[in-house]
Amino acid sequence: MKRLSFLLVIATAFVLSVLPGYAQDATSLTWATFNIRYDNPDDQANNWQFRKDTVTRFIKAQDIDIAGMQEVLHNQLEDLLQRLPGYKAIGVAREDGKTKGEYAPILYKENRFEVIDSNTFWLSQYPDSVGFIGWDGACTRIATWAKMKDKQTGKVFMAVNTHFDHVGTTARRESALLIIRKIKEIAGDYPAVLTGDFNVSFDSEAYRTITTNPFVLKDAEKIAGKRTGVAYTFHDFGRVPADKREKIDFIFVTPQIKVSDSYIPQEANTDGKYLSDHNPQIVHLIL
């Protein structure tokens, strides 16, 4: 009987080791979503040229492993990569599928992660049509994804990053459904993390579409063991009244992933400069 029990334990361990999303060692990651605000000369003192060093210092200080970023123009992407040796970026710009317009890039530590596959699709009725504006959207929107492997543990997972439309309610709902379909199709049983500026708060249809879908995606902040910092992300460089500020940037995870803590820093950094018109959100995940 003891021999049979021992063999069952060994067999179970073997099966788990070869199933998607399982490996011998857990993977612990520091993951962020961060709308860095596009390089707009009208921002004057808050223009990118005055914030880029503050942003990159923040990323280094937080030791972020992977970041989904939004509103990143090509020159901003170059600035980030120049100032962040050891990081690489995945993604293309939304207007031409190359360098024109905003990226929704995935920034990651090159020495830790192997990119197995990656691509960008357009949030529209025609996801492979470059530059297409979907449904009732005001402008072109994209999602960038990557299937990655942690070189330290062998864990395979999917990262998805997006920026939803700021006008179209149908576009936001349909974008949510499209991304869920893509995660199911590409990730399968592997863990997946969705980051983005969703341009909606908790009580929106798009948020409910993501969190109540039969394919489960959980709001990382809500399931975190510990939550610190402020409760909002968008503040418009401090111009939104304190009682009107909302959380419109989110990180969602599949059920295999544990969230040890979630942190949204105060909008003004230690040197007195704003990081952006949005606060980033940082989570520590265990895959």
Summary of predicted features, one role per range:
Residues 2, 6, 19-83, 96-101, ...:
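N-terminal, active-site-proximal structural segment of metallo-dependent hydrolase catalytic domains
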Residues 40-46, 64-66, 132-133, 161-169:
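Second-shell loop/turn segments in exported
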Residues 4-14:
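Sec-dependent N-terminal signal peptides
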Residues 30-36, 55-80, 107, 146, ...:
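Active-site beta-strand/loop signature of hydrolases that rely on acidic residues for catalysis
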Residues 112, 170, 174, 181-192, ...:
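Metal-dependent phosphoester-hydrolase catalytic domains
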Residues 138-140, 149-173, 186:
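Metal-dependent phosphoester/phosphodiester hydrolase catalytic core
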Residues 66-157, 261-265:
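Structured beta-strand-rich core segments of catalytic domains in phosphoester-bond hydrolases
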Residues 36-39, 72-76, 94-98, 112-113, ...:
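Solvent-exposed loop/turn segments at secondary-structure junctions
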